[in-house]
A protein has these predicted regions:
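Low-complexity, glycine/proline-biased repetitive segments and flexible coils/loops
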Residues: 1-221
Length: 221
């Protein structure tokens, strides 16, 4: 199963905190009749299917005036760890899940996330399958870390998104993608070989992995 991409960073001034266990931001003081720049970053493209060592692109950053949130980390396949997506930026997101093959048994670390990065890290890959195909980790979300691979018969679940009523309706944002679904993350992956699904538009969720060793998820915007 392919590794899931990380969800985008989640930042809010509402109660309940921002992603990764961080505190809520101070509410912005906006002035009437003033133009403010808003940029909505696109999700990162998934890696090419059936390509050894492929890695999905990280999502692009989103911004409101001077407040910046990095996109989700892309997941890497075939013996590598996921991208942490702007780990040196204090608005970075959770990282993509990792992939580990039963062929090379290399250590495969997922992308990281911290409270300062507004997202949790991805899950670890595993070689625990019975048919030689590895189980991959889920991508980290704003509300929780990605699940490790090897639990049951598939890859790890994506990390949960962060629940917010910013739109007036309770919604989970910036969930990590995984072979198994997660609140706010990518939909359940395809059951045949191929690329994973994209995350849900407008939520910053990471894309799912897929039921194939070389497929990886998309990074959330």
């Amino acid at each position: 199963s392919g590794a899931g991409g990380g969800g985008g960073g989640f930042i809010t001034s509402l109660s309940g905190g921002s992603g990764g266990g961080s505190s809520s931001e101070t509410a912005a003081s906006l002035q009437p009749s003033t133009n403010y720049t808003i940029t909505v970053g696109a999700g990162g493209a998934g890696a090419v299917y059936n390509t050894s060592g492929a890695i999905g692109a990280s999502g692009q950053e989103s911004s409101f005036n001077s407040l910046i949130s990095k996109g989700g980390g892309g997941a890497k396949s075939y013996g590598g760890g996921g991208q942490s997506s702007g780990a040196n930026n204090n608005k970075a997101s959770g990282g993509g899940g990792s992939f580990l093959t039963s062929i090379d048994s290399l250590s495969s670390n997922p992308g990281t996330g911290t409270s300062a990065s507004r997202g949790y890290g991805g899950g670890l890959g595993s070689t625990g399958s019975t048919n030689g195909a590895p189980y991959c980790g889920g991508g980290g979300g704003a509300g929780g870390a990605g699940g490790n691979g090897g639990g049951g018969s598939a890859g790890g679940a994506g990390g949960a998104g962060k629940e917010s009523v910013i739109t007036g309706v309770s919604t989970f944002f910036a969930g990590g993608g995984g072979y198994q679904s997660a609140t706010g993350g990518g939909a359940i992956a395809p059951t045949s070989a191929g690329n994973g699904n994209s995350g849900t538009s407008g939520t910053g969720g990471g894309g799912s992995g897929a039921n194939h060793s070389y497929s990886v998820g998309y990074g959330g915007g």
